[in-house]
Amino acid sequence: MAKRQLTRRQSWRIEKIQEERAARAAKRESRAVEELEGGDLGPEQNGLVIAHFGVQVEVEAEDGELAGQVCRCHLRANLPALVTGDRVVWRAGNQGGGVIVAQLPRRSELCRPDMRGQLKPVAANVDRIVIVFAPLPEPHANLIDRYLVAAEHAGIRPLLLLNKADLVNEENAAGLDALLATYQRLGYPLLEVSARQGAGMQELQAALDGHVSVFVGQSGVGKSSLVNSLLPGVDTRVGALSEQTGKGMHTTTTARLFHFPGGGELIDSPGIREFSLGHVRRADVEAGFIEFRDLLGHCRFRDCRHDREPGCALLKALDEGRIQPQRMASYRHILASLPEPEY
């Protein structure tokens, strides 16, 4: 059944209701912070945001007597928006709970536009983005390339992960092999695993240990199942594929951080079906295709759009086989999806 399209007035009304609810929640939160700060608060200490719940976050104490304990904290009104992975300074309350008083500088952040097109961080201090795909739902190179551009733009190392490798069969093997070969030729690290059967999971654990990683990928590729396999005993509601569409049904409802025994962390974020890159410029997309980098600036015309222009270094490389046709098609598709001024 097709999804019903909202009119502009309906969309405005929904947005207005959400704003009113957010304002009421912020007012209640402000009163809660005032009550906490009116009592006795403990000393300032460092903490790690491991989950975000609207106007409150869960903080894991990193030092002091409470080290390792998790506390639900309120945020001071003057703080910027916090996300899972943020490191903060907080103070514990005498009735439980606590107050976050400062955000520590981020080493990196992974961002995407929200429904209004405004840039919104989704995870902080990540140093590895694991791009998960599977034989089902059918993987699309364009979506993988969008994630790679986002990773390159954020300065976060990507790892390509084919999950549900046990579902590879005669019908999809050739297409998957061609897809994987494209990225292997570019030098991207790639692993094949089966969370259900356990194949390749030790290699994946070794690749994640010592890093702060985030799993991304369309719904239904098994991100929550991977977490359950990597961290037995952790409950991340596992969903199934829709029998009608073959697409994934969303499961995880909030980004959450988990610790690995080897010292690394994993941020499990909500499944997303379409990753928008509306916040990047044309130059960012070009730089996100790593095989373009040595060619950029060598076209005959400074404002070359790499379409039909004579003397284009990228088109020459495409003709010579140094750029794969699939990647050039993805590049053009991504550019076409950008806001008009950036295209």
Swiss-Prot record:
Annotated binding of GTP, by residue: 163-166, 217-225
Cystine pairings recorded for this chain: none
Annotated ranges, domain CP-type G: 116-275
Entry GO CC: cytoplasm
Domain of life the protein comes from: Bacteria
Cofactor(s) it depends on: Zn(2+)
Subcellular localization: Cytoplasm
Record key words, sorted: Cytoplasm, GTP-binding, Hydrolase, Metal-binding, Nucleotide-binding, Ribosome biogenesis, RNA-binding, rRNA-binding, Zinc
SUPFAM superfamilies recorded: P-loop containing nucleoside triphosphate hydrolases
Record EC number: 3.6.1.-
Main localization (coarse): cytoplasm
Cofactor notes: Binds 1 zinc ion per subunit.
GO biological process: ribosomal small subunit biogenesis
Pfam families: RsgA_GTPase
Residues noted as binding Zn(2+) in the record, renumbered to the chain: 299, 304, 306, 312
Quaternary context: Monomer. Associates with 30S ribosomal subunit, binds 16S rRNA.
Sequence similarity: Belongs to the TRAFAC class YlqF/YawG GTPase family. RsgA subfamily.
NCBIfam families (UniProt xref): PRK12288.1, ribosome small subunit-dependent GTPase A
Task performed by this protein: One of several proteins that assist in the late maturation steps of the functional core of the 30S ribosomal subunit. Helps release RbfA from mature subunits. May play a role in the assembly of ribosomal proteins into the subunit. Circularly permuted GTPase that catalyzes slow GTP hydrolysis, GTPase activity is stimulated by the 30S ribosomal subunit.
Annotated protein name in UniProt: Small ribosomal subunit biogenesis GTPase RsgA
The organism of origin for this protein: Azotobacter vinelandii (strain DJ / ATCC BAA-1303)
